[in-house]
Amino acid sequence: AFRASPINAQAEPGHYGKGWDPLTQLGADWLHGLGFRGEGMWIGVLDAGFENVDKLPIFETARQQERIHEGMDAMASQAGLYAHHRHGTSVLGTMAGFLPDSLIGTAPDAHYWLYRTEDAYSEFVIEEDYWIAAAEHADSTGVDLINTSLGYSLFDDSTMNHTAQDLDGHTARISQAMTWAAEKGILCVTSAGNSGNSEWHYITAPADAHGILSVGAVNGAGQHASFSGWGPSADGRIKPEVMALGVQAAYPHADSTIKQGNGTSFSSPILCGASACLWQAFPEKSAAEIRNAIISSAHLSTQPNDSLGHGIPDMRWAFALLANAGAANWSSMGPENSDLLLFPNPS
């Protein structure tokens, strides 16, 4: 049986504002239209700070419904989670945001545990340990998913640097820990990194972890964003696993405005929220089954490559796969016809 939310938001462009394009690119508007908007799902957000999340109007509904929970500030700042960097604010907004006609996120009805693990003003390997501590706490709360819009490769102390050969899922501590979290049944979603244009070029840790969804960035036409990190992993696995919007993606700024920006920091939570909605529809499925359906639904699933991975998922097709419905039965699942599954061929 499917576990749907009561219909409380229209799944149509005007109502979603700038949140419509990332939703429809993944076919997740269809899930929202069925009432699957993340209710009952718990998402841990491990990031660099959540400035003004306790005040911004876009999070008012989630606050009033007590769906935003303070996890931990791994750096033990007296100022607290809501006084530091705005990166986590923007990331959270792409999922949890609910500001009708301006921006509605991909999982506006989910619960969120917030964790500050990243020191946005310096880069040291201890931040990977902060992430591990937060992930352990998130696991203890029973989160279903974890979003990590962070990536580690080069540090302020160059003796700490990772190398491309380290990206095997077993070397960087944060990648080891994310693999363990996935093995424990958490669906871990992380950004592929923004090093595609740099000398580094590849994904960054923990995108090399095993059993996760690392997410690269595409534009609105489904084309690879030049900054999005490339695969494969050091041990030859397809990376990133999938793609989502990361070019001119809408997000809430800590000053209350809605802005648009680029980065796999946006593509990861956009996909994470949509994944939560899919899992809401199939609560009996495991994280691994949800992950496999998402990868199998992507438009390059049978011909993956090092820039787009398996491509852009289609949550409608993932839904059909989880419901054990083949393509011949697709029309009975709800969409009017199967040509809704087609994507533009990225160039």
What are the residue ranges of the model-derived segments?
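Subtilisin-like serine protease catalytic core
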Residues: 30-72, 76-127, 141-144, 156-158, ...
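Active-site-proximal beta-strand/loop segments in catalytic clefts of secreted hydrolases
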Residues: 45-49, 72, 94-98, 110, ...
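Short, compositionally biased serine/threonine- and acidic-rich segments at solvent-exposed termini, linkers
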Residues: 323-331
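Hydrolase catalytic cores
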Residues: 92-95, 113-119, 144, 202, ...
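Short acidic, glycine-rich surface-loop motifs adjacent to enzyme active sites
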Residues: 136-168, 191
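Autoinhibitory propeptides
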Residues: 1-23, 29-32, 210
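Surface-exposed, proline-anchored Ser/Thr-rich loop/turn motifs
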Residues: 330-347
